[in-house]
Amino acid sequence: MSDQKVFARYKANEIVTDLQHFGVKKFKSNITRRKNALRKIIANLVLGNYGEMSVLFSELLKFWQIEDDLEVKRICHEYIRVIGALKPQQAREALPFIMDDFKSRDEKLQIMALRTLVLVPVKELSDQAFDCIISLVNHKSPPEQVTRTAIYALLDLDEIDHERVLGLSSILHDIVKAQSSSPEVIVAALHTLYSIHEKNANMEPFRIPLELAFDMLELLPELNEWNKATVLEVLTTSVVPQHYLDTHEMIELALPYLQQVNTYVVLNSLKFIMYLLNYVDVIKETLAEKLSNSVIALLDKPPELQFLVLRNVILLLLSRESSLLRLDISYFFIEYNDPIYIKDTKLECLYLLANKETLPRILEELEQYATDIDIQMSRKSVRAIGNLAVKLDEDSVHDCVAVLLDLLEFGVDYVVQEIISVFRNILRKYPNNFKANVTELVKHTEVVQEPESKNAMIWIITQYSDVIPNYLELFRVFSSNMFSETLEVQFSILNSAIKFFIRSPTKETEELCMDLLKGCIDHENNPDLRDKTLMYWRLLSLTKTSRISNAITFESLKSVLDGELPLIEMNTKLDPTVLEELELNIGTIVSIYLKPVSHIFRLNKTKLLPQSPILNPNKDLLPVVGNSFPPTGANRDRQNSESQSSTKSRKTAMMDDYDKPAEKINQLKGKRKSSSNNPSKLSRKPSTLLRKLSMKRPFS
């Protein structure tokens, strides 16, 4: 039966015809028809047809009694999970059948039954779930998958009865500390304890002893990819180093997982290492290279993962005054087939990586993007050039302005408008450096059509009227159509007219000013514009009437309405507290938004660095050295000697991948050759083949 026929709303009596009371033999001979009817029930539950489907409860119980088919059992359990929350009495009636499945020898049935007990919010089922979990974790040799399910089920039961779950937490602690269970069960217990602490705001942050942290790190080779990532995530903020030597050893144990193919493992390893770097005295140069190479390797992932990585690159670039990552800017050059969200994020990375040395190559790229056929990309590239001019020092701004003036000659309307918009910010930062270019900008007065570019052009004409001979003529291009403009442009026109009159109270400026004031009062209905107009009118009337005791002079009025503007600055720094919290959430959705957790998930706990005698108050002062770390493990008495011997045996394991190509073993690619060394623009951007040919071993 097709999905289209299954996923349709049915009446209960329509499905009952397929579930009529036949004998057991009749049921056995009509399996397909019976299963299709059951599938229709689940499909209607998905569609929200609860009222009709709840009528079929008694029919479903009869199937439950006689059927051994796993799919039928799965449908029955799914039915109870959905209907049980709406009809608690039906869930109670189904409890004996659920327990029969739990007591069976089939692990899959046991897991189904346990999940049903946990997910139905009925007291009788929850009590039975607690009893089942206790019996499983206390059993001498329970099935591994069932035990894992039971441990993870405590997270759902925690929302129902937190105090009762806390009573079982000691059992989970024993599982983790004993290290006698299977690795998957140990990880499940560790993650459950961590999640319970994270979900409850009134509980202290989860902490584990240092020795247990080393045991978990040494257990990583035995785990699958997802469990590796889970352990690394839990260890972040849970283990608090007390000595530099311990920190360096944990970093060494976590470093190999930067080379994993699984992105989740790499990001959690990166997060764990970045966390530990808050508790070191020095940073090794090779560590910075390995971190950089792992990030570079992640840039070859699919676009969705690449976007996550790029957002985390922005976070890491913001984390220190001098970035720890050694990233060549060519990795962030935009490709024609990049999605728009990748292009935007790469532009942000280029902006953060820009300095005096990299600026020429970045400007060369941005100039090409600005002439691209993609209008949105072209605009953002021009905006990026303008932002770089404001961000960098005075020596670099001339290069940015030269590129903008070249693009101005390009003559495309949207490019010209964007250039005028960004030039306003440049003139705000350097008011006296580019007066000679103002006359070139105002030649394009007729081109500007968008509110932002109109505002920018009006501001430029007003601010530099002393170097524009026909400034009033240019201004009338905008003022003549004032009442058809947007509100923000109307404000700009009104402000500029007042400034012209205050600076030069001639008959021409007075007429212009009075016409606009009267027009705003007589023809405009916007209360904000009318209020501002009346305020200006009142101020001007006070300057003209000397008989009034509170009259003010033109000079006083000029200081209020036409004062000197402060220089603007581009601030790319985040609040240190917010930055600290974001670093502890690398690889999560918080790192995409670059906002505190509380702004995105209201109920989540804020992560902070645990206090320690070796916690660095200012990581910008950490030296990056080329010499090796102190010998790991020296002068440290490990409590578990068996763990030491197992670690040594793992380190001396024979290599079993000698017959595989090197590129299959090491998935990371090396630093791409710089494209700016070749003056030819045709071969300036490296192709995919060139990238592969320029690969080298990143961790050598």
UniProtKB/Swiss-Prot annotation:
Keyword Membrane: yes
A GO MF term: clathrin binding
SUPFAM superfamilies per the UniProt record, alphabetical: ARM repeat
Entry-annotated residues carrying Phosphothreonine: 652
Localization per Swiss-Prot or TrEMBL: Cell membrane; Membrane, Coated pit
Biased composition, class Basic and acidic residues, residue ranges: 653-663
Stretches for region Disordered: 625-700
Main location: membrane
Pfam families attached to this UniProt entry: Adaptin_N (PF01602)
InterPro entries cross-referenced by the UniProt entry: AP_beta (IPR026739), AP_complex_bsu_1_2_4 (IPR016342), ARM-like (IPR011989), ARM-type_fold (IPR016024), Clathrin/coatomer_adapt-like_N (IPR002553)
Note: Present with 1670 molecules/cell in log phase SD medium.
UniProt function note: Adaptins are components of the adaptor complexes which link clathrin to receptors in coated vesicles. Clathrin-associated protein complexes are believed to interact with the cytoplasmic tails of membrane proteins, leading to their selection and concentration. Beta adaptin is a subunit of the plasma membrane adaptor.
Protein name: AP-2 complex subunit beta
Species per Swiss-Prot/TrEMBL record: Saccharomyces cerevisiae (strain ATCC 204508 / S288c)
Gene coding for it: APL1
